[in-house]
Amino acid sequence: MSDAPAESAPAQIDPAQTDPAEQPVQILPRERSDIPDAVARIPRPPVPHLDPPFALRVARLGDADMVAEWMNRPHLAAAWEYDWPTPRWRRHLGAQLQGSYSLPLIGSMRGVDLAYLELYWAAKDLISRYYDAEPYDLGLHAAIADVKLVNRGLGPMLLPRIVASVFATEPRCRRVMFDPDHRNTTARRLCEYAGCRFLGEHDTTNRRMALYALDAPTTDR
């Protein structure tokens, strides 16, 4: 769906568990540390639900080999710029699983894993520097592993279902954010198809993003 650029404050790294040459690497490069305590205390994002034949589950450390292989495929390496080796992916997944900022997910169809997603609190993420974030705004990044499935209608089919589940599971969330690279026409078309509001293009440290918000439906009483 959208790329996930490396930026923001460094996360804590245990020197005993990392190669000295890798110690300066930020484990969760988009996570902010300069946030209010009330935002920092919000627990990790909810797990969305999808009806069969699709499913979502929380990623495990054992998925690191699979996710690393996916993210080193050319179409995802270009979009995400997270073409890391397995050890770094294991740390990236572990940091998310141990924290409350972002939740890594694996998407499947008929029992076959085919997508990697990250559902994160936007107020804890670098994008909150570029719009007026509410504490329970959520953001979503998604990657379809098989290039043959890209542009085959999976995004338009599944995005509304995932977002509807997010709103149902966490009613305090009133919008879901997307921040594709401004050149990512596929992701931008999907945002527009889903009914997102365009919040402009913004220059970050290493790229220019197009910011979108998908608002929760309102109920007329």
Swiss-Prot record:
Pathway: Siderophore biosynthesis; mycobactin biosynthesis. GO terms for biological process: siderophore biosynthetic process. Gene3D superfamilies: 3.40.630.30. Residues 1-34 are annotated as: Disordered. The keyword Transferase applies. Keywords: Acyltransferase, Transferase. The keyword Protein biosynthesis does not apply. Substrate binds at H141. One of its GO terms (molecular function) is N-acyltransferase activity. Its EC number is 2.3.1.-. It comes from the Bacteria. The active site is at D179. Monomer. Acyltransferase required for the direct transfer of medium- to long-chain fatty acyl moieties from a carrier protein (MbtL) on to the epsilon-amino group of lysine residue in the mycobactin core. Belongs to the lysine N-acyltransferase MbtK family. This is Lysine N-acyltransferase MbtK. The lineage of its organism: Bacteria, Bacillati, Actinomycetota, Actinomycetes, Mycobacteriales.
